Swiss-Prot record:
Membrane topology: Single-pass membrane protein
Entry keyword annotation includes Nucleotide-binding: no
Family: Belongs to the PsbT family.
Ranges annotated as spanning the membrane: 3-23
Pfam family, one: PsbT
Name used for this protein in its record: Photosystem II reaction center protein T
Length: 31
């Protein structure tokens, strides 16, 4: 179960970084 918790935290961190970059720079993907 430790691996599951580690993956969850890692995914959350990646999500935060992704949104931070998305809001900092204009969206270049799509549209």
């Amino acid at each position: 179960m430790e691996s599951a918790a580690y993956i969850l935290v890692l995914a959350l961190a990646l999500g935060v970084i992704f949104f931070a970059i998305a809001f900092r720079d204009p969206p270049r993907i799509g549209k």
